[in-house]
Amino acid sequence: NGRRVAIEPEFAFQAKEAGLDMVYLQFDGTTNESNAHRHITNLFDVREVAIDNLAAAGIRITPVVTVINGVNNHQVGPIFDFCLAHHDKMGGPAFQPVSFTGRDEEVTDEARLRQRYTTSHLAHDLARYYDGRIDPYRDWYPLGSATALAALADHMKGPEADFGQLSCGCHPNCGAATMMVANAGTGQWATVMSFFDLE
């Protein structure tokens, strides 16, 4: 539907009127080349139009990135930069390292090993890209650990709040996350954990 939103801006407004307030948008890089491995026409330039049309309709975007080693892993930093620069239209990216299952039965073991990418790779690649500003050991934690923060935020809003915070009760090995805060005026950012002495 990203391509349709780019071609038909009114579709985004119709979706908003029907109650849609957030979408997941496949986002494998900040260039057409980094999106070309999907062999579809909804490349980066089309996604940019879709992002603008969704934002104009008041729909928030979560960019979803399938990271494949040797294909678009060099894009994880630029994707973060893009999301920060467009924070008024989208949230942080949801990186999903490639998983070879199901319909990927024809993938050879050599290709599987060559293209494998894990959340640990992601944490270290972002640390290198940002010269250590994101620490792979200090700043990353299991997704489910944010549930306590979500519960606290819900409690602070009180029982009259319209909608609660998102929480994830998944297995600790299911995924990892890092939280950042950014100054909308200056664009400066820091990881939340960098404000604390964890020692």
Residue ranges and their predicted role:
Residues 52, 56-199:
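Radical SAM enzyme [4Fe-4S]-AdoMet core and its adjacent flexible, acidic
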